[in-house]
Amino acid sequence: GPEKRYKITAGQLRAAITNRTRAIIINSPSNPTGVMYSREELEEFAAVIAEAGIFVISDELYEKIVYDNNRHFSIGSVPSLADLAITVNGVSKAFSMTGWRIGYMRGPKDVIAAAARMQSQVTSNPASISQMAALSALTQITSEVDIMVSSFEKRRNLIVELLHDTPRITFPRPDGAFYLFVDVSDYFSDRMPNSVALAKHLLEEHHIATVPGSAFGDDNAIRLSYACSERDIIEGVKRLKRGLGELG
């Protein structure tokens, strides 16, 4: 929950692994929370994963969108996981190329070969234009990403400040990505029993779009995105506060 920044510990990971476990998925920085695991935490995870001999699939699409002068660490770089780590990335987030549909992965040769066989039958190949655009982004673009991340950090600071005095909600301060995962369960009632109902209320009555936390495994929260202008953030928070205030 928010009190532990929606993080798990190496001990919790070890306890969750059974003889049926084949892989775990790590998303850092995280969608929906924006929370990022530290190098020390990931190295502790790596020890557990190597001991269990299972795969780790590391979703690192937000690796470049990190704040407060922190640095992203890839669990795939831990030597003990050379044959167990599958790193997944893409150009959608860091380079704002969502519609180009380009992703990539790195991992053990046999795993990549199997994935390639499946991918070739499911989606065939990405468009050649998209491939060349992604190559240019990955090899030539740096300052533009830094400018974008700086803008996101300002928006993160703004939305956190605006929500700071909102009663009866809790959320972790994001380390990266561009989301807030806000626990709104104190506003639930017989009339508003869960995150889906609350998100529907905010959309239909106050015209702000949020994502119910049930989509991410926590029905107590809703996800907010600050991938928009500062003006929209200010107006959106006003509407959110008004919408929550109506619920008593």
What are these regions (language model features)?
Residues G1-G248:
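PLP-dependent class I/II
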